[in-house]
């Protein structure tokens, strides 16, 4: 088990406990199983039935949550510091003693099937799924974390138990805890409730890193008021410095109300309410998206605007002078400072750093390295990354 504790002057304790297993490690016949098991963690253990478990979580008086992403399944609890030990004990029970009652499996299967169907009604979410499906041939990024209806319907209790017993082992568990308690005290509590968990060898599926396809695809959907346009770029193999430069570029391109795309598509032309970039630098993911939603009559001009903005940045026509770069640095440093102030945010940050085998003090390095980013670094990474996108356009049927 990997445990990191962060001592902070606070009355709140934030615990993030997770298993390094998510959608990118699932085989084709397992798509959605990590997410399904995340749901089942709350459905009863050897020592607590569903009702008891959820009542005790509620009685902690704080907030609890769970999520599954590309490479992890995570449970988080934020409570008053006096509830730290009880929270750790409950999480220990969930991670070691989940029972998968058949009646709860069937009930939760319907919930997840409803979640999958409902996601198709979310135009934004649906558009991202379609561009991922279009962009990749074999990469796990083409599959949704929820899975699909056919596979979710096929999962058996035996399959859940085998997957749970294979990956829910201490040597695949990562925990971050933020509180006012000293490190040794927190370690003693974790050891108390996880000491009997048996170490076991396991092997994750090898993850394929794949460059996106260079193509444009148009899909159609019934009862759609707006059309969506999504660009996807993959960015494997960048250095840390290039990733920092790309972070500044992404912010300037589409992450603020003064970004290039926002001003061109919304302020100047009134085409879109939503327009933004989304940068994901997670291991094995490494993607940059551009998303907007416009009227069908404006799709062609929107494509021209996005393409022109990209080319203008690559050619240096859209400048990154010292004032612009310094502002971007200030914004990124402010975001880091906000994270450090919030116990839940810093706990989540530390959790993902350790699960990705990164330095938990990387933000200090990033803040220092930001000062070394120059205009040419941004243009260089723009010319390296902003080429041959996958473009998906969704129109009304």
Regions found by a protein language model. Give the residues of each.
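His/Glu-based metal-binding/catalytic segments typifying zinc-dependent metallopeptidases
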Residues: 4-18, 201-260, 394
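Short, Gly/Pro- and small/polar-rich lid/capping loops
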Residues: 1
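Active/ligand-binding-proximal structured segments within catalytic/core domains
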Residues: 7-57, 131, 231, 241-253, ...
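Charge-rich, well-structured scaffold segments of protease-associated domains
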Residues: 52-202, 219, 236-237, 254, ...
């Amino acid at each position: 088990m990997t445990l990191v504790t962060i001592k902070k002057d606070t009355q709140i304790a934030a615990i993030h406990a997770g298993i390094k297993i998510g959608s990118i490690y699932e085989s084709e016949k397992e798509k959605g199983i990590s997410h399904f098991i995340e749901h089942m963690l709350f459905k009863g253990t050897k020592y607590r039935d569903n009702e008891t478990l959820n009542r005790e979580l509620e009685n902690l008086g704080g907030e609890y949550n769970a999520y599954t992403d590309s490479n992890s399944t995570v449970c988080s609890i934020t409570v008053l510091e006096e509830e730290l030990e009880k929270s750790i004990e409950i999480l220990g029970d969930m991670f070691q003693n989940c029972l998968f009652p058949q009646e709860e499996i069937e009930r939760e299967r319907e919930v997840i099937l409803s979640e999958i169907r409902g996601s198709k009604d979310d135009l934004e979410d649906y558009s991202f799924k379609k561009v991922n499906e279009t962009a990749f041939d074999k990469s796990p990024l083409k599959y949704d974390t929820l899975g699909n209806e056919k596979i979710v319907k096929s999962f058996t209790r035996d399959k859940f138990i085998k997957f749970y017993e294979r990956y829910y082992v201490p040597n695949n568990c990562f925990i971050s805890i933020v509180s006012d308690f000293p490190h040794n005290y927190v370690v003693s509590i974790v050891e108390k409730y996880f000491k009997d968990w048996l170490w076991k060898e396991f092997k994750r599926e090898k993850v394929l890193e794949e460059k996106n396809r260079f193509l444009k695809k148009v899909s159609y959907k019934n009862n759609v008021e707006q059309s969506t346009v999504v660009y996807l770029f993959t960015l494997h193999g960048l250095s840390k410095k290039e990733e920092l430069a790309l972070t500044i570029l992404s912010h300037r391109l589409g992450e603020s109300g003064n970004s290039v795309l926002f001003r061109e598509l919304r302020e100047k032309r009134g085409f879109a309410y939503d327009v933004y970039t989304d940068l994901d630098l997670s291991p094995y993911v490494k993607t940059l998206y551009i998303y907007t939603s416009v009227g069908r009559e404006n799709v062609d001009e929107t494509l021209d605007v996005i393409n022109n903005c990209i080319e203008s940045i690559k050619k240096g026509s859209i400048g990154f002078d010292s004032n612009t770069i310094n502002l971007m640095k200030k914004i990124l440093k402010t975001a880091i400072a906000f994270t450090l102030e919030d116990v839940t945010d810093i706990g989540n940050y530390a959790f993902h750093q350790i699960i990705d085998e990164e330095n938990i003090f990387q933000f200090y390095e990033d803040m220092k390295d930001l000062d070394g980013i120059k205009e040419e670094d941004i243009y260089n990474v723009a010319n390296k990354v902003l080429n041959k996108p996958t473009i998906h356009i969704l129109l009304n049927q």
